[in-house]
A protein has these predicted regions:
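Nucleic acid-binding interface residues in structured DNA/RNA-binding domains
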Residues: 1-95
Length: 95
């Protein structure tokens, strides 16, 4: 794994319960502000156990095809979800 991917994974791994951020937030925090699509690719392809459910698109939409599972995970952490979007998180962009 290259250094760029490792930095992105480290940022994702550090997300707290109830924290919801965007792909762009992760990319920026890892030092690659223009690489939000790479964050999605890493989440979709890595074998590492990561809290993928805490990452959403720029308007708070859940991951297509995984909405039910993602919403359940987020709700278990105290995040409000309705109509396929994060409405209120404990921490992060949508708090």
């Amino acid at each position: 794994m290259n250094e760029r991917d490792r930095r992105i994974i480290d940022v994702i791994r550090a997300l707290r319960d109830g924290e919801v951020v965007t792909y762009g937030d992760i990319a920026e925090d890892a030092g690659y502000p223009k690489m939000s699509r790479l964050v999605g690719r890493i989440l979709a392809t890595t074998d590492e156990e990561l809290p993928w459910w805490r990452v959403v698109n720029s308007v708070g939409r859940l991951v297509p095809g995984h909405e039910r599972e993602q919403a359940a995970q987020l709700r278990s952490e105290g995040v409000k979800v309705s109509d396929g979007r994060v409405r209120n998180a404990r921490y992060g962009r949508f708090s």
